[in-house]
Amino acid sequence: MRERVIGSWDELQSAVFDNAWDETILRYRNNRVFRGVSDNRWGLVPSLNRCCPQNPALERHILRNFRKYGYADLTDCHSFWQLVAMGQQFGLPTRLLDWTYSPLVAAHFATEDINSYHIDGAIICCDMEKVNYCLPDALQEILRKESCNVFSMDMLDSVAADFSALQRLSPDPFAFFFEPSSTVNRIANQYALFSLSSDRDVLIDTLPCAEDAFLRLVIPAHLKLEIRDKLDYINISERMIYPGLDGICRWIARRYAPLGPMFHHPKGKDR
């Protein structure tokens, strides 16, 4: 994966909005999505692979138990894809990865953990169009028909009922992005979407045809506090990311933590 170290708040803005102009429609649009991580060393490894590294086949048992024990709160989940997306939003180990269309929401996730302010963070940028080069013909045709780069749940339902059906579409692994239904406010507020690999053992950034699709923007530890405070000024905070009392309490706890004395690095001083 290509890598670029960010030197300032202004450079971060320049990097995430680079090449956003689309001459064909005379608007600022691009095909990139973003993922913020508090530790730059982290790869694009789904929670399922982290939770069950020795036996990812436990995936079906995880989903079965989620449906069984969460039944009362899942009555509106009529689609397999909606079920998996809901589980991902609430911390269930899945093969999905969280992304956002908003680079500033990604910057929030890269800087929200105050226990990681001594570690470089990162925003990973992905060109969805390049990832879609790996798709089997049936899926590419759906995207062409809809003139888009991202699947909706209805589009997925029309071609594959679950992970097994998805894998049968091609002997070669592939990955794609899909938008969940906004059944909970945090999905809409985070401008969220997910990536998904047809083979749970294959990471999205290891696909041969997508190797040039990713860029890692490294946020040095000494920049985290400045970026964090400036995000608060433009209302990118836990109050918006996690609607409700949970987000308010997270925001208050961080806002009143003694981060300045702990992590402020005057310019020109040794960091």
Q: What is each PLM-predicted segment?
A:
Residues 1-271:
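Catalytic-core elements of nucleic-acid end-processing and repair enzymes
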